[in-house]
């Protein structure tokens, strides 16, 4: 059959992920945007934006980009290289069942996983309520007064507990006692944290070796890593007598049956909520918890959700006591924690809401009964089982049979834990089935069935729990799945995430988290692998990590990568520890000064302080660049003790500084190293490599540049890249035999989310990644151009360009109309937008980062909203609007405002449907402006009474 003469084949590629799915503007839209910016081509704009002195010489190249289907096939092939074996290794990681209703409606729901940290409380009420449930759950189970909204992992939480103890203890000792029954990874992390700060770690049997007179605190594992369940009440009382602090690392599932740490007198409790429905995922991510006595709440790290009121007096939630955090206190902060594990904390809290106290107790009892049955069978075979009392973990003395039994267990598709040279550890969980127990018995040479053994309790009677927990009605209201689904939907509808609108947060890179990238994280071949399995059972993971590491090295110009840091702040810390170890290895342990510009992110000075360094602040010029005269002077002044400098590139002011190479040369000349914060890597990929311009180490925020979602405040990943001379000092891990420098509980951090970044790289290819960077720069310059005349862009390059973000000045609005940056942020909610980054790095400004994923239409909607806000401020300044009773001061407006009595001098239409706001699909803030002062003065950090829920539902 002949073709019609006018028929032609299209060159349109429907599965071109980079250009059709990830990058927002179409080629035609880019042309329109370039005209507004004033450039004939995208390359011409890039040439004027990125200094030639730092431009990458060779393009990124690692094969053609894959389609979504090709990438998913590659991921499936890789996942199948992981061997699915039932792991009874324990050691803080356990099999768990994620209720499908939670997997579908939380973990796989972009309304939850694409949200940002809830700094804007009005548009985060759903997430904040879920986190308040988490805090309530933790307080109930631990028997303590105040809990935070998650930490990175149990080992990190233990290190934070040690830091609190040193800060608040009356004892002036410089030693910290660690129970030898703590998990090995916890002990390793405690040693890492203590060494730079000059604290001594004493590991031993607390009932024999603890001298409370010489320590500022102690931590005990409950139950212990080898299974022991012990009462620490007497030891804790002795510590208190001598002015020391007591912390307990407790398994929350065990606390359903056991006396709480608070009832023992503990000051701090930490642990992991992983077994509350969060898969092990080769080490993470999981939400750790921390709870403290009320007296220590202001020393607690991380986010803390509290109850406040809005402008109408209605209940509202917000982040409380923020003045203790790194973004406020910098090197004086309680911790460098920024990203935590909000998405996983939400999952754990929903697990408790779904099961309630009866369900949690039943699961705990079932796990214990299965463990008792297992022990009875092993004892019948003649083995010595320790300890006498336990919850879910036993240790078996096997002598020279250790290797044979471990091998036999693997043949039964079961992993057991190797302890020393003569013992085997076994930990059961809610996924353990009768056939699992029978397989273990066979590995030990027995042929039993579970019904041969009657389970009983092997818990000490004096430690059986008698106090209630999860008593709040929220843990009793949603047992029916229909109600559970609706509850999660109601919470999600209160929030504003990327599934509704762009989130133009400067320095946060809220880009597309593509569905194809997210799918593999729930595959059991990735999600059910224990972090301490033999290497030959995780070949898929090792291939993925190695290939992603090679790609990141190619992108950054570094020689080696560590995937262990599970947040950007932990990456900073790991990089600074590598620099410190390098200096010590070269006999320069006296080098402890870190130069940091005043514009640096708050985690920079906080991390430097944790690494044992002295922070020396460097001035920033009026142009937003490092003040070179001051930098040279400080480098010269501290030449003998200079350890490093920390810089962000492009700068936190949104420009490529021309003098970055000179900065690096000055530091190296004076014996220091250069830490380049990779938070703004989205402006560099494919165009410039940190390792080529003089930097020695950087962390990369995979939850920014490489598409891991922010999850409402975590998870994140902060791997570090280093030049060859620092490679020997990358983080080690006890499981790999390298005990020094561990910064996370698992060897590869939050490994189960690495498939997201890997698939992003596969689908974009080197060319696509470079194009994404260029479009990110175009979008930022387009926004700056559209806002020209209404708002001043504070910082530009010599050629008038910004990098991937821009800072607009809202201070003139305050001067002329009394309109604050907070007013602008709240008015943007009425328009359906999350505000840009507020008052950082300059007070009274907004930092806008649109990313490459936003279309021209969405950018225009955002710009229209800001321009309309500027006109409202002008109307106030000119007397056409009241200075107090106006749409800006009263924002955000709610449905209750719309339908209630209206006595305001502006219309409902103007209040609720400003330019930029959708009419049919408008986002409505569930609360009016939240009262921050009230929330801190009347601190409540657990669920409010049930009456308030009934009121909210009316």
UniProtKB/Swiss-Prot annotation:
This protein's record includes keyword Oxidoreductase: yes
The keyword Lipid metabolism is annotated on this UniProt entry: no
Cofactor(s) recorded in Swiss-Prot or TrEMBL: pyridoxal 5'-phosphate
Top-level taxonomic group: Bacteria
Name of the top EC class for this enzyme: oxidoreductase
EC number: 1.4.4.2
Gene3D superfamilies, sorted: Aspartate Aminotransferase, domain 1, Type I PLP-dependent aspartate aminotransferase-like (Major domain)
GO cellular component terms, semicolon-separated: cytosol; glycine cleavage complex
GO molecular function annotation: glycine binding; glycine dehydrogenase (decarboxylating) activity; pyridoxal phosphate binding
Entry keyword set: Oxidoreductase, Pyridoxal phosphate
Chain positions with N6-(pyridoxal phosphate)lysine modification: 704
Chemical reaction(s) catalysed: N(6)-[(R)-lipoyl]-L-lysyl-[glycine-cleavage complex H protein] + glycine + H(+) = N(6)-[(R)-S(8)-aminomethyldihydrolipoyl]-L-lysyl-[glycine-cleavage complex H protein] + CO2
Swiss-Prot/TrEMBL GO biological process terms: glycine decarboxylation via glycine cleavage system
Matches recorded under SUPFAM superfamilies: PLP-dependent transferases
Parts forming coiled coils: none
Cited HAMAP family: GcvP (MF_00711)
Function: The glycine cleavage system catalyzes the degradation of glycine. The P protein binds the alpha-amino group of glycine through its pyridoxal phosphate cofactor; CO(2) is released and the remaining methylamine moiety is then transferred to the lipoamide cofactor of the H protein.
Family that this chain belongs to: Belongs to the GcvP family.
Subunit structure: The glycine cleavage system is composed of four proteins: P, T, L and H.
Protein name per Swiss-Prot or TrEMBL: Glycine dehydrogenase (decarboxylating)
Phylogenetic lineage: Bacteria, Pseudomonadati, Pseudomonadota, Alphaproteobacteria, Hyphomicrobiales
Gene symbol of the encoding locus: gcvP
